[in-house]
Swiss-Prot record:
The gene is xpsH. The keyword Lyase does not apply. Cleaved by prepilin peptidase. Methylated by prepilin peptidase at the amino group of the N-terminal phenylalanine once the leader sequence is cleaved by prepilin peptidase. Keywords: Cell inner membrane, Cell membrane, Membrane, Methylation, Protein transport, Transmembrane, Transmembrane helix, Transport. GO terms for biological process: protein secretion by the type II secretion system. Component of the type II secretion system required for the energy-dependent secretion of extracellular factors such as proteases and toxins from the periplasm. Part of the pseudopilus tip complex that is critical for the recognition and binding of secretion substrates. This is Type II secretion system protein H. Its main location: membrane.
Length: 169
């Protein structure tokens, strides 16, 4: 048997009393809190990692390292030497298969490597051989006080990439 609930009546009024329950928060309030937490997290991450410039530096360093690894893989797969070229002044790089790219203008680029494989004085080149070995080289990327280094071993052709920590004075 079901019992019907009657609205509560105030003793001096004939109209029902409306109870307001303030037990929770609205969906809009929850979304606002989540958005504020996300914004604070993004700002904290940007401040701790060097912000946009740091992201550009890491992105450029990782892109160059990936293209160097690709060039090495192509040399091994095709059995013919392959060359990776970088132009520090123009901030451009080229890899086999038509791969090429530009580096952000804010970056300072420095190349150290064997002159024998450089076709031009102002251009750096790293050549990879069919056995995976290379002529070796180093690419340093700098923006403000942050540095990223990409090293290529001349015996193994191994590509290593990462931030370069400068000792505190």
């Amino acid at each position: 048997m079901r019992v019907a609930r009657l609205p509560l009546l105030h003793p001096h009024r004939a109209a029902p009393v409306v109870r307001r329950q303030l037990r929770g928060s609205s969906l809009l309030e929850m979304l606002l809190v989540i958005a504020l937490i996300a914004l604070a997290g993004v700002l904290a991450a940007a401040a701790l990692t060097g912000g946009i410039d740091g992201m550009r530096l890491r992105s450029a360093g990782k892109a160059i390292a990936a293209q160097l690894r690709y060039t090495r893989t192509q040399a091994i797969a095709t059995g013919t030497p392959q060359r990776f070229l970088i132009d520090p002044q123009q901030r451009r790089w080229e890899a086999p298969g038509g791969h090429h790219g530009d580096l952000p203008a804010a970056l300072e680029v420095r190349f150290t490597g064997a002159r024998q494989v450089q076709s031009r004085q102002d251009q750096g080149a790293i050549q990879f051989f069919a056995d995976g070995a290379s002529t070796g080289g180093r690419i340093d990327l700098t923006i403000k006080d942050a540095r990223w280094r990409v090293d290529v071993g001349w015996i193994t052709g191994e590509v290593r990439s990462g931030p370069l920590r400068t000792p505190a004075p």
